[in-house]
């Protein structure tokens, strides 16, 4: 997904691709529950955040290169690649009120400052934005796929009137008023009108193939919409640094 975005937007393909592969390296087992547990245990030492741990792995913990003083510089990646892998370019102390998301630990400040030299404070570079969007598209689509395969979601019920209405109400609550019921209903209808949409699931090989086709269709649709809107917003101006 990241490479498709990079190619279409004229970004450095290898930089975006590497960022997509690297950005979750610091996340622990058990997902965000594991991250919260580690954060509690490390509270007296500045806490724990998976994204900040990613930067530490790339620049210190993975021992591939060493400086003249014998200190590890990690994988010795380029400034652009490290910056593209940084989802939250700020420390815990600089994070927004109520947010526990940050991109580097205080004792990693020197490498962060080198990485972000000349960049606007708290603004992700365009390659990091492409990585972030790729991540959103990938996990959103594949979470749906996993839910269908695990039989947590029944496409037949989802498409029924009662299931449809329940879905709209649930998403409306989750979005906290960001989208109206009408907007959500229209969005669902657009997806359900896709030729690849599943109306039932019995777990057959044919169903599995149909589900794979649907997820591929959704990835292409979401990536394509982002590409079109981004190019239109840029007005022909180059996006690459």
Predicted regions and their residues:
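Sequence-structural signature of the catalytic-core scaffold of metal-dependent phosphohydrolases
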Residues: 3, 7-8, 14, 25-208, ...
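Substrate-recognition/cap regions that form aromatic- and gly/pro-loop-enriched pockets
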Residues: 224-241
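Short glycine-rich or small-residue beta-strand-to-loop segments that form or flank ligand, phosphate
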Residues: 18-22
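Active-site and substrate-binding clefts of carbohydrate-active enzymes
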Residues: 205, 209, 213, 241
């Amino acid at each position: 997904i990241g490479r498709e975005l990079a190619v279409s937007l004229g970004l450095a393909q290898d930089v975006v691709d590497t960022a997509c592969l690297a950005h979750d390296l610091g996340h622990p087992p058990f997902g965000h529950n594991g991250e919260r547990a580690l954060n509690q245990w490390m509270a007296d030492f500045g806490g724990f955040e998976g994204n900040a741990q990613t930067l530490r792995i790339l620049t210190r913990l993975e021992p591939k290169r060493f400086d003249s003083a014998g200190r590890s510089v990690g994988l010795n990646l380029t400034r652009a690649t490290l910056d593209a892998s940084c989802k939250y370019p700020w420390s815990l102390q600089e994070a927004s009120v109520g947010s526990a998301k940050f991109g580097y630990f205080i004792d990693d400040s020197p490498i962060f400052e080198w990485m972000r030299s000349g960049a606007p404070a708290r603004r992700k570079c365009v390659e990091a934005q492409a990585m972030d969007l790729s991540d959103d598209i990938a996990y959103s689509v594949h979470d749906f796929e996993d839910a269908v395969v695990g039989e947590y979601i029944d496409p037949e019920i989802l498409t029924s009137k009662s299931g449809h209405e329940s879905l709209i109400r649930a998403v409306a609550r989750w979005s906290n008023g960001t989208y109206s019921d009408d907007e959500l209903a229209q969005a669902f209808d657009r997806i359900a009108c896709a030729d690849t949409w599943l109306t039932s699931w019995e777990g057959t090989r044919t169903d599995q193939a149909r589900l794979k086709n649907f997820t591929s269709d959704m990835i292409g649709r979401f990536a394509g919409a982002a590409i079109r809107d981004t190019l239109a917003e840029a007005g022909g101006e180059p996006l690459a640094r």
